Amino acid sequence: MGRSYIVVGGGLAGLMAAIKLAEAGQRVRLFSLVPVRRSHSVCAQGGINGAVNTKGEGDSAWEHFDDTIYGGDFLANQTPVKAMCEAAPDIIYMLARMGVPFNRTPEGNIDFRRLGGASYSRTAFAGSTTGQQILYALDEQVRRFEAEGRIEKLEHWEMLSVVKDGEGRCAGIVAQHLKSMRIGDFRADAVILATGGIGYIYRRSTNSVINTGSAHAAVYRQGASYANAEFIQIHPTAIPGDDKLRLMSESARGEGGRIWVYRDGKPWYFLEDKYPAYGNLVPRDIATREIFHVCYDLKLGIGGENMVYLDLSHLPAERLQERLGGIVGMYEKFVGDDPRKVPMKIFPAMHYSMGGLWVDFDQMTNIPGLFACGECDYQYHGANRLGANSLLSAIYGGMVAGPKAMAYAEAQRTPAGELAESWFAAERGRQEAEQRQLYAMDGPENAYRLHVEMSDRMVEHVTVVRTNAGLRQTDDFLQELQERWRRIGIDDRSTEHNRTVPFVRQLRNMIELARVITLSALNRNESRGAHYKPEFPERDDANWLKTTIATRTPDGPVLRYEDVDLQFIAPRQRRYDVSKAKGAVASGS
């Protein structure tokens, strides 16, 4: 019997992994919560990094690698990051051949812009809808393989758990069809998770509401390790709103946008004043903390509210339309002001998780046969992600995971199709029993209200500025929520298209993952990248230059630590008030 594979997640990482397997002649089933083209990758705006150096600035894969390690405050393992940066130019050219309509220079070359934390212009972009254009291009390739019978899409399916054989190896998944509510088991010789971010753990973020992290938590509950959970990226520029927060891409600053507030009656460009070498293109963690300082400490937010200006009005309207038309139109639609004429009002928002499932350099988790790639793994960004590295890491992670999953599967003696039915029936039965319990829940608590309470508390204590007292209170509160979750009442018992029952299950998983994030942050007594504690304001390499790894126990997460791979670049002080080279000299003197 031949080998078969399952990919869970229809964003960039999942599509790329499926494509690599199909290219090798393998059979792949691709599961997605939503139609593939509605995956959250479609929301990415700014671009994808690669040191192509068509502008002759002196960029190289090494410079990209150094910027990424430096920007991540030296917490990323260097071997996979170096390989990713070396592969990046070819990935961009591959996407162009697939039909991604990257902006071009007058000479016909792919155009590149500079984003935060980058020393050079290395971000290829398709206006301000790069994620959408790449997602659609990859989906066209997947559809070709569908027509050839090598990929089968199963949309509107949610993975509930993995199936493990008697030796603890992943042999498939149990999933639920969200229309019929049917639960089924599916065999695979290897499973690749590409299930995206965890933004819905926070009340309002730039993420889609499907980004619950529930799949991460499901396999964490089954023994998968979770790494660097404490590193949550807060994007400095989002459009405030009552329902959700809409990202205002870093490309707005890459094209010349300036952040400012009034001070003493005059515009104060505070990032340019404090960080003259990078100005408005400092990394996201730094820009976010400065905006918080201006609004909360200096009380200089617009009209006394927590907002600052992001100004594009000094730039030519034609250029804005050509290069930023998508986000300019979005702001005008949702706010009613024209950014070509008046400054935009923005404020930071939860955006991305640098942490994720622990994987080795082959993208495999500690559960044999279970791989992870994209935002759901922890591998490429350290303590802070640079803009436009997310699309790159998603695609590159998928390119690695596909072939490595195939190599793993082919090395196994017994194909999943020949394993005993009992393993699959037992796990399916466990999930069906759990579903019956969910339907029977008849307590006084409301699941959606519990989610609001949890996500508000996470925003308050586990985002930009963290204190140990606040983190302890948050963990105590999350444990209370776990008890209150047991007293939820289900108000919808329909057996088709039921949205409440899956949400209650997802909420349990979100609370579980929120505890991992909170306790990982509580334990790390230093400030590094996106993790900032005023009580411990400096980076502490002697004690904390290490990866946090969480393992689940019945009493909660147990944390251990793993050394970081530092074989290429020695850690140095991270500064953005001077150029990177000068900062390196200053820290070594």
Regions from the language model: what does each represent?
Residues A190-L245, I302, N384-K404:
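Glycine-rich loop(s) and the adjacent beta-strand/alpha-helix scaffold that form part
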Residues A96-R182, R187, A194, H235-P240:
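Conserved redox-cofactor binding core of oxidoreductases
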Residues G2-R3, M181-A190, N366:
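Core beta-strand elements of the Rossmann-like FAD/NAD(P) dinucleotide-binding domain
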